[in-house]
C-alpha cells in the first residue's frame, strides 16, 4: 500500500500529467475488450500484456495518469522481450487501444528502417532513426553537411563541447575516420536533442520522420531554439491527436503546420491562408526532403518558413500538393495516403504514381503549375521580409532572390493572350525597323 501511495505521490509531483476525464482513459474497458473480443494471443503474450495493463492501472488514482507512463507501457505491448508482435499486429493493437479511448488517429507508423529483431528498446529505436537521418543527410548533401559542422553562427553547436573538440582533433588519420566521427557525434547529439524536445511526448518518436525534422531544427536553430520549436510542434500535434477525431492525412498535417507558422510568424500564416485559392497541402516528409537539399546560406533572421519557401524556386511544389491531387483525381483514382504508405521522400511519392502506371500525369506541368500558384505568395512574403529585416546580408539575399524569381519566371507567368500581344508588338517593331533602316 505504501508503495502505491509513493507511486501516486510521484504522479502528483510530475508536471507531465494528463487528466483522465479529458481524454477518457478507461483501463478496465481496454483490458476486457482487448482480451475477450478482439485478439487471440498466446498465453505468454497474454500474461505479459496483462501485467502491463495491471501496471498502468496502478498509476490511475484520482483521475490522474502520467501520459508518458501510459504510452511507455503501451509500447511494451508491441516490443516484448524475447519476442515481437508483427508490425501489422502492433498497429492493430495500438489502433484498438486508441479506439477504445475514443481516439481514432489513423497514423500508427513505425520507424521506417528498424526491423522487428532490432526493436528491443526505446533507445534502439531512436538511435536507428537518428542514424538514418544523419546518414541520409550526408548522402544527399555531403558538402553542406560538412559546412554545418564548422558553422560558428549556430549557438550550442554539437562541437561547442570541449571534449568533442578534443576528440575531433584527435581523429584525423584519414577522411573516413573524420566522417565517421561526424556521423557518430551527430547521431549522439541528435538522440539527446530528440529526447529533450520530445519531453513528455516520448511516444511521438513513432511519428514518421520526427528525428529528421529534429536534425535540421538542431542544425538551423541550435539546441536552445530548436528544442523550443520542436516542443511546440509536439504539443500542437498531441493536442490535435488526443482531443479530436481527426483522420491523420494531408489536412491534418496542414492544420498542425499552419498553427506552428501562426505562432512563429502570423503575417506569413495569414498570407498563406489568404492567397492560396485552394488549401495548400503540407507533408512533413516533403519538408524533410526539401531541407536535405538545403542551400549554403542560412541567416539568423530568416525564419524556417522563409528559408523553406525562398531557398529554391524549383522546389515550390512542396507547398501545394493539391495540384497533384487534382490531377490524380481527374483520371478517376482516389488519392489518399494511409499509414501503410510511408512516403519518406518525394521520389517515393512519384514512384508510387509510376507503380500505379499513371502515365497520363505530366509531372513537369504539375511542378510548373505549383510554381505559378505560389508565385504571388513568394513575392508578398519576400517583400514583407525585406521591409522587416534589419540584417543587411539577409535583406540583400532576399532582394536578390526576388529579382531572380522575376528574371526566371516573369514570361512563363504571362497569359497566352498577353504573350501573343507581346509577340505581335515585337513583329510590328521589327517591321518598322526594317522599313526605316533597311530600305
Each model region followed by its residue ranges:
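N-terminal transition regions in large eukaryotic proteins
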Residues: 1-194, 395-439
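Residues within HEAT/ARM-like alpha-solenoid scaffolds
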Residues: 88-92, 181, 185-189, 208-209, ...
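Aromatic-anchored, charged helix-turn/loop surface patch used as a conserved interaction hotspot
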Residues: 105-152, 231-286
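Extended, Lys/Glu/Leu-rich amphipathic alpha-helical scaffolds
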Residues: 227-281, 313-407
Amino acid at each position: 500500500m505504501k508503495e502505491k501511495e509513493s507511486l501516486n505521490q510521484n504522479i502528483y509531483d510530475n508536471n507531465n500529467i494528463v487528466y483522465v476525464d479529458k481524454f477518457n482513459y478507461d483501463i478496465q474497458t481496454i483490458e476486457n475488450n482487448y482480451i475477450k473480443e478482439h485478439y487471440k494471443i498466446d498465453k505468454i503474450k497474454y500474461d505479459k500484456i496483462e501485467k502491463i495493463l495491471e501496471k498502468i492501472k496502478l498509476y490511475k488514482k484520482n483521475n490522474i495518469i502520467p501520459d508518458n507512463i501510459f504510452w511507455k507501457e503501451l509500447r511494451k505491448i508491441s516490443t516484448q522481450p524475447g519476442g515481437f508482435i508483427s508490425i501489422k499486429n502492433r498497429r492493430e493493437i495500438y489502433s484498438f487501444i486508441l479506439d477504445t479511448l475514443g481516439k481514432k488517429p489513423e497514423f500508427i507508423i513505425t520507424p521506417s528502417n528498424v526491423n522487428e529483431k532490432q526493436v528491443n528498446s526505446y533507445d534502439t529505436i531512436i538511435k536507428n532513426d537518428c542514424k538514418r537521418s544523419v546518414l541520409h543527410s550526408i548522402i544527399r548533401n555531403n558538402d553542406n553537411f560538412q559546412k554545418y559542422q564548422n558553422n560558428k553562427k549556430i549557438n550550442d553547436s554539437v562541437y561547442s563541447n570541449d571534449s568533442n573538440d578534443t576528440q575531433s582533433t584527435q581523429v584525423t588519420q584519414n577522411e573516413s575516420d573524420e566522417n565517421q566521427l561526424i556521423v557518430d557525434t551527430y547521431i549522439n547529439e541528435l538522440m539527446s536533442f530528440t529526447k529533450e524536445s520530445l519531453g513528455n511526448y516520448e511516444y511521438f518518436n513513432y511519428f514518421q520522420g520526427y528525428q529528421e525534422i529534429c536534425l535540421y531544427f538542431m542544425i538551423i536553430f541550435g539546441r536552445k531554439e530548436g528544442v523550443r520549436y520542436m516542443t511546440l510542434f509536439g504539443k500542437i500535434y498531441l493536442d490535435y491527436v488526443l482531443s479530436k477525431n481527426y483522420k491523420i492525412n494531408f489536412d491534418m498535417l496542414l492544420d498542425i503546420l499552419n498553427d506552428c507558422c501562426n505562432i512563429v510568424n502570423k503575417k506569413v500564416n495569414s498570407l498563406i491562408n489568404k492567397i492560396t485559392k485552394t488549401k495548400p497541402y503540407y507533408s512533413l516528409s516533403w519538408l524533410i526532403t526539401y531541407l536535405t537539399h538545403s542551400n549554403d546560406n542560412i541567416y539568423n533572421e530568416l525564419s524556417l518558413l522563409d528559408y523553406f519557401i525562398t531557398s529554391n524556386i524549383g522546389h515550390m511544389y512542396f507547398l501545394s500538393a493539391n495540384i497533384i491531387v487534382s490531377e490524380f483525381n481527374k483520371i478517376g483514382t482516389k488519392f489518399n495516403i494511409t499509414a501503410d504508405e510511408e512516403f519518406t521522400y518525394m521520389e517515393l511519392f512519384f514512384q508510387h504514381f509510376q507503380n500505379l502506371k499513371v502515365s497520363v500525369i505530366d509531372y513537369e506541368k504539375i511542378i510548373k503549375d505549383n510554381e505559378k500558384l505560389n508565385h504571388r505568395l513568394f513575392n508578398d512574403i519576400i517583400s514583407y521580409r525585406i521591409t522587416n529585416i534589419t540584417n543587411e546580408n539577409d535583406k540583400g539575399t532576399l532582394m536578390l532572390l526576388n529579382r531572380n524569381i522575376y528574371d526566371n519566371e516573369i514570361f512563363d507567368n504571362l497569359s497566352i493572350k498577353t504573350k501573343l500581344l507581346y509577340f505581335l508588338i515585337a513583329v510590328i517593331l521589327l517591321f518598322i525597323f526594317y522599313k526605316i533602316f533597311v530600305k
